[in-house]
Swiss-Prot record:
One example of a Gene Ontology biological process annotation: D-amino acid catabolic process
Family: Belongs to the DTD family.
Position of sequence motif Gly-cisPro motif, important for rejection of L-amino acids: 137-138
Function: An aminoacyl-tRNA editing enzyme that deacylates mischarged D-aminoacyl-tRNAs. Also deacylates mischarged glycyl-tRNA(Ala), protecting cells against glycine mischarging by AlaRS. Acts via tRNA-based rather than protein-based catalysis; rejects L-amino acids rather than detecting D-amino acids in the active site. By recycling D-aminoacyl-tRNA to D-amino acids and free tRNA molecules, this enzyme counteracts the toxicity associated with the formation of D-aminoacyl-tRNA entities in vivo and helps enforce protein L-homochirality.
One term of GO molecular function: D-tyrosyl-tRNA(Tyr) deacylase activity
Protein name: D-aminoacyl-tRNA deacylase
Coiled coil: none
GO-annotated cellular components: cytoplasm
Subunit structure: Homodimer.
Length: 150
């Protein structure tokens, strides 16, 4: 499981012109599930998202988590995080989990984040989304579930 975490001033997802999810200051997280990922990966990734200290404290040091600052989280499913571009000119997505499994795992990440008391908005699974992200910093980090070590 992979999560691309971005610190943002705001984020928003629209599908066919209608807003399906939006947040103020916090994190936009693109989440992809890979072959062989499971519930333990979802829990691990959610714990990292909730507790990574990537927001500044009074001294300007990254010392606070999204939970600490009262930020929100926008989770967007993103199978292209498993795109393999090593051969040819078209990415291969064979390492991405099948859609039903990916949906279950992305929903598990969202559920775990909510258990941590976070306000979580989401995109729409398997839809063509327009994602607006106003990065802050920018701060962008990749987290991989323990099963996805590569």
């Amino acid at each position: 499981m992979r999560a691309l975490i971005q610190r943002v001033l705001r984020g928003r997802v629209t599908v066919e012109g209608s807003e399906v999810g939006a947040i103020g200051p916090g994190l936009v997280v693109l989440v992809g599930a890979g072959q062989g990922d499971g519930e333990a990966d979802a829990r691990y990734v959610a714990e990292k998202i909730a507790h990574l200290r990537i927001f500044e404290d009074e001294q300007g040091k990254m010392n606070r988590s999204v939970s600490d600052v009262g930020g929100e989280v926008l989770v967007v499913s993103q199978f292209t995080l498993y795109g393999d571009c090593r051969k040819g000119r078209r990415p291969s997505f064979t390492q991405a989990a099948p859609p039903d499994e990916a949906r279950r795992l992305v929903e598990a990440v969202v559920a775990e984040l909510r258990k941590f008391g976070l306000t979580v908005a989401t995109g729409q699974f398997q839809a063509h989304m327009v994602v607006e992200i106003i990065n802050d910093g920018p701060v962008t980090l990749m987290v991989e579930g323990r099963g996805g070590e590569s």
